[in-house]
Amino acid sequence: MIIYPAIDIRGGRCVRLTEGRFDAETVFADDPAEMALKWAACGAEYLHLVDLDGALAGEGKNIPVIKRILEAVSIPVQLGGGIRNMQAIEKLLELGVTRLILGSAAVKNPQLVDEACKNFPGHIAVGIDAKNGEVAIEGWGKGSGVAATELAKQMAQYGVDKIIYTDISRDGMLTGVNVEATAEIARAGGIEVIASGGVASIQDIKNLLPYQKDGVTGCIIGKAIYTGAVDLCEALALAKEG
């Protein structure tokens, strides 16, 4: 299982939100590239970046910071937040991002996902952010009326490389990963899923490991590695063993 340390960028700084709320922000570092180096030094194999300003604005807002991170580390990086057209996809892949995560676009513009997967196979993931099984869109601001499992099936047909599944009600709350819902998405789509939202302790990693057989192949850890609730080095070692 791959552990993805999360670096959420807002206003050029590394922050964490609680339940995706922009009015509930904690700043953890002024330089996200330093954070990236720290996690890479721990042995991280892959980084998860989110352009929070981009998610809200619908276009990339922290490109200089993202560029600095890509120059600082040699490990692959996946990025989400405000990627809503082919021009942005091409630009970010050229910049050196390995995997791009399409969010709201998957619901509002599925043709974009289809086209991106055809043009850049293996580089496109879809973020399914859900509350009570319903997909949320536009920086989690509103519900879509679409069931998360149905969206997973549709995305699998397009040839999406991975799904990043976030249970919004648990994100940044340190209440534990919604393991069952994550595994259900993997089974529904027959596609690899990365768990996100709510990692509170090393136990969450242990709870996810048995679901690798269902297709849960990764886990994003955010707030817990910043507060010290999870030791990233320990989590990485555990995931490697599993």
Q: Where on the chain are the PLM-derived regions?
A:
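Structural preference for beta-strand elements that scaffold enzyme active sites
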Residues: I2-A6, Y46, S74-Q78, R99-I101, ...
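Conserved, mostly hydrophobic/aromatic
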Residues: D8, W39, L47, L92, ...
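Conserved anion-binding
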Residues: G12-V15, E19-D23, V97-D171
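Glycine-rich, proline-tolerant flexible connector loops at the mouths of alpha/beta enzymes
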Residues: Y46-P64, S104, Y165-T175
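Glycine/small-residue-rich loop that forms an oxyanion/phosphate-binding "nest" at active or ligand-binding sites
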Residues: D53, K61-K118
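Charged helix-capping and loop-helix junction motifs
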Residues: G60-K67, P110, G141-E150, T175-E184
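Catalytic cores of alpha/beta
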Residues: V73, V77-R99, E180-G215, A235
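C-terminal helical cap(s) of enzyme catalytic domains, especially alpha/beta-barrels
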Residues: L112-N119, L209-C219, I225-G242
